[in-house]
Amino acid sequence: MHAGLCYSGGKDSTLAALLLDSFYDVTLVAATVGVTDAADHAREAAEAVGFPLVTVELDEAVAHEAVDRMVADGYPRNGIQQVHDHALETVAAGEFEVAGTVETFDAIADGTRRDDRVPTVSRAQAQSIEDRYGVDYLAPLSGFGRSAVDDLVEATLVVETGPSEEIDKGDYEAELRALMAEEHGEEAVDEVFPDHDQTRVVGLRDR
C-alpha cells in the first residue's frame, strides 16, 4: 500500500512518516505554491531521513485568499487551516510520478497531533475525503500529546530549532508569510504571526 504524507521537513511530519513506514510505502509530498524555496527545504529534510519526496503545486488563488483572511482576522489559524484542507484534497485527487511510475496514493496522511489547534482534521472531514477520493486518511500522531512527541523526537531525530521566520522549512507558513509581506507589508506579518519556534529535521539519531 502506498501512502502520500504532506511533509514540511519538521519533526511532526517526519515522525508520522517513521510511524507509517512499517505498514506503507511512504512518499513524502511537499505541497507548495512556488513562491519560496519551501519545497527544496522539504526535499533536503526528506533526503536526510531517507524517504522519497514529490512536490504538488497548490492553487495560488487559495493561498492569496488565505492571506487576506489572516490579515482580516488578525491571526493565522483559519488561513493555515484553509491551505491545509486544500493540500489534503489536492494530494488525494492527484497522480504523482514516483520512481519513474505515475501513481495515485492508497492513503494520504499528515503530521497533525492530538493537541494541535491548527491544522486539524475533523472526523467528518476525514470521512468526506475518503468517500470522495477513494483513499484512506491517516493521522499517525493523533493519539500523541506534546510530551510524547517531544520524547520521540529526542530519541529519534536530529533537529534544528529556532524562530519560525529563521528556520528553513517546507511548510505553508513560510510561503504564506512571503505572500503576506509582498501584498500587505512586513508589518502585517509581524501583527498576524505570533513569535514561536519551529523545527527542521536534519537527520536520524543512531539507534
Residue locations for each model-derived region?
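Nucleotide-activated chemistry modules centered on ATP-dependent adenylation/adenylyltransferase
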Residues: 1-24, 29-207
